[in-house]
């Protein structure tokens, strides 16, 4: 039934920014297992917020949610889309600091985020799934083609780093 998890289903706990909402109460079957998604929203959360050294409201909310989930659960993390917006996050840093190297900035952002998740997960042993950054829905009238291509490159590099760092760190 819609909105109700039965005992036959395995729960996937979904944590993240607004893209996690598309998973809420979603049911699907994989290899004859039935899964049910429960989403927890952290409005405005970026990987940068979680991966930096500063305690902030995003970390506090993430940790509150993360520690309430039963140990050894399946957890889907959907964080990173805001880091990759055309007028926020990485693009804004590059615009304001032209000497910053794009590849290094993205790798540092992703690595710090993954390390943060690994550190939190040491005692919980959750099975972590990292969701990549989706293709944005951009109004082409508001941005020139070069800017859109630059954003596309940022997302491509970001997702490649997410995949590679997650794999390297055995996440």
Which residues does each predicted region cover?
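Conserved SGNH/GDSL esterase-like catalytic core that processes O-acyl groups on lipids
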Residues: 12-112
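A structural motif corresponding to the C-terminal end of an alpha-helix
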Residues: 112-130, 158-171
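Active-site-proximal loop/turn and secondary-structure-junction residues that shape catalytic pockets
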Residues: 81-83, 134-137
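Long amphipathic alpha-helical scaffold segments
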Residues: 1-10
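A generic structural signal for alpha->beta connector loops
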Residues: 9, 31-34, 125, 170
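A structural signal for short, well-ordered beta-strand segments and their strand-loop junctions
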Residues: 13-15, 74-78, 125-132, 170-171
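Residue-level preference for short coil/turn positions at secondary-structure junctions
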Residues: 7-8, 70-71, 124
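Substrate-gating cap/lid alpha-helix
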Residues: 138-171
């Amino acid at each position: 039934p819609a909105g109700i998890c039965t005992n036959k289903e395995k729960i996937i706990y979904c944590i993240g920014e607004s893209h996690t909402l598309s998973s809420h109460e979603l049911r699907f079957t994989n290899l004859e297992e039935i899964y049910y998604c429960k989403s927890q929203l952290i409005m405005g959360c970026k990987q940068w917020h979680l991966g930096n050294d500063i305690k902030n409201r995003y970390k506090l909310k993430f940790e509150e949610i993360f520690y309430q989930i039963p140990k050894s659960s399946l957890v889907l993390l959907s964080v990173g889309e805001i880091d990759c917006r055309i007028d926020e996050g990485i693009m804004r840093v590059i615009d304001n600091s032209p000497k910053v190297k794009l590849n290094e900035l993205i790798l540092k952002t992703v690595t710090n985020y993954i390390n943060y998740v690994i550190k939190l997960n040491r005692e919980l042993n959750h099975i972590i799934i990292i969701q990549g950054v989706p293709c944005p829905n951009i109004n082409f009238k508001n941005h020139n083609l070069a800017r859109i291509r630059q954003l596309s490159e940022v997302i491509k590099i970001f997702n490649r780093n997410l995949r590679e760092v997650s794999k390297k760190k055995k996440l």
